[in-house]
Amino acid sequence: MRHLSSPPWPLLLLLLLSSFTSGESSLSAEKNKLHTGGLSRQSFPKGFVFGTATSAYQVEGETHQDGRGPSIWDAFVKIPGKIAKNATAEITVDQYHRYKEDVDLMKKLNFDAYRFSISWSRIFPEGSGKVNWKGVAYYNRLIDYMVQKGITPYANLYHYDLPLALENKYKGLLGRQVVKDFADYAEFCYKTFGDRVKNWMTFNEPRVVAALGYDNGIFAPGRCSKAFGNCTEGNSATEPYIVTHHLILAHAAAVQRYRKYYQAKQKGRVGILLDFVWYEPLTRSKADNLAAQRARDFHIGWFIHPLVYGEYPKTMQNIVKERLPKFTEKEVKMVKGSIDFVGINQYTTYYMSEPHPTTKPKDLGYQQDWNVEFGFAKLGKPIGPRAYSSWLYNVPWGMYKALMYMKERYGNPTMILSENGMDDPGNVTLAQGLHDTTRIKYYKDYLTNLKKARDDGANVVGYFAWSLLDNFEWLSGYTSRFGIVYVDYKTLKRYPKMSAQWFKQLLKRNNK
């Protein structure tokens, strides 16, 4: 039997070289995955803010302790079948106790700011009146620690979570009293936290609140006409419009309080956060172009038009007629110009077309009033790759068009891109979850289009990724993961994904 000796040295050298180069190439492949596509902090103007975003109900947990009152979502999640796997947000990712760990993560990843929301019912368990000082103490701890770590707080006052007490007292957002109660709550927050918080937002996605809560009833408080959803009460033809009217007035009243009593001294600003799906005409036909414009008017225009011009879009006035509330002269003065900046939550784009055949609907409702057909493909070709959520397609050019639309149609207000991101399924393993190269591509492509819009004159001054953490994703519960940090829901341990490392690389400062 021939003796099996070591390979001769030239062969050994060859083997060593090949193993070195293959190791080097796998290292280089990993580096390529973190490649920022030419983007860096220096691609954006000095002072451009990069942050991440979450909301109180989705990340805090501790819903029943320390004096917090229930919100409409605490009641809604208890209805069997409303939330995937009947999940609740009682613990979620427990930021209430782990906020220091989360702020430390933001710092390590080179972010500048954190957009969080304050739970109205944690401050005022009954919606008004008695203050829960333990809740106030929590937000003081969170804000103080952010400031200590050099993370700028962006505080949102309302993210879907109306105090349940107000829903029971006067039907919540359907009651005119909510305008004063919200302004009182906002003023308390300015007075209490405004020495450190200089960036305030009144409402997150108020359109979603009105449409999903009162037109099809799939969100809390679950009201709609029977023709449009499984609701026990509601009126899709009128309630979404009444709710929106009250939301706009509540926003304007809160801004008025800030400008009158706090802005000069605190030197902060107040805005609102609006969701904006870009609607692209399916064809070049006049009918499809009109359908796309109708969709934009009923979507973003419903809120931004009154805030900039003091009235609802003409399209809406002509279609909704007497079902659309009107602003008084005094209200117009309060509403018009009531934004120091506007946040745009931009995730995706859809095709819009004129429905065929066009028939007069039997039942009236907000979505029905659009009279459009949604499309996610053209000539069999999808508009973009789909994320896990059925509504979310990766269409980066829609970001550019949405921002340029705001520039051209609404006087180029100061804007922050206040949410942007994509999800993976909730059941991905840790290894799969960490290797989120699709998310990196999503962020790279969308940020490239944001930069293009900025270069073409859109006044965008900040960008917030949704979300810092995997968390409670409303109807999807824990079956959808939007975070750049993976959370093990059993242990609540945080694991930064590749996308988090990508942001760390992107946001390196020159002196690092």
Swiss-Prot record:
Position of the signal peptide: 1-23
Domain of life: Eukaryota
Subcellular location: Secreted
UniProt GO molecular function: 4-methylumbelliferyl-beta-D-glucopyranoside beta-glucosidase activity; amygdalin beta-glucosidase activity; beta-gentiobiose beta-glucosidase activity; beta-glucosidase activity; beta-mannosidase activity; cellobiose glucosidase activity; esculin beta-glucosidase activity; metal ion binding
Its biological purpose: Hydrolyzes p-nitrophenyl beta-D-glucoside, p-nitrophenyl beta-D-mannoside, cellobiose, 4-methylumbelliferyl-beta-D-glucoside, laminarin, amygdalin, esculin and gentiobiose.
Native species: Arabidopsis thaliana
Assigned keywords, A-Z: Disulfide bond, Glycoprotein, Glycosidase, Hydrolase, Metal-binding, Secreted, Signal, Zinc
GO CC terms: cytosolic ribosome; extracellular region; plant-type cell wall
Residues reported to bind a beta-D-glucoside: Q58, H159, N204, E205, Y347, E419, W466, E473, W474, F482
Activity-pH dependence: Optimum pH is 4.5.
Glycan-carrying positions: N86, N230, N427
Catalytic class of the enzyme: hydrolase
Disulphide connectivity of cysteines: C224-C231
Catalytic activity, EC: 3.2.1.21
Catalytic activities: Hydrolysis of terminal, non-reducing beta-D-glucosyl residues with release of beta-D-glucose
Catalytic-site annotation from UniProt: E205, E419
GO biological process, one term: carbohydrate metabolic process
Quaternary data: Homodimer.
Family named by the database record: Belongs to the glycosyl hydrolase 1 family.
Major localization listed first in the record, in broad terms: secreted
Keyword DNA repair: no
Name this protein carries in UniProt: Beta-glucosidase 44
InterPro entries on file: Glyco_hydro_1 (IPR001360), Glycoside_hydrolase_SF (IPR017853)
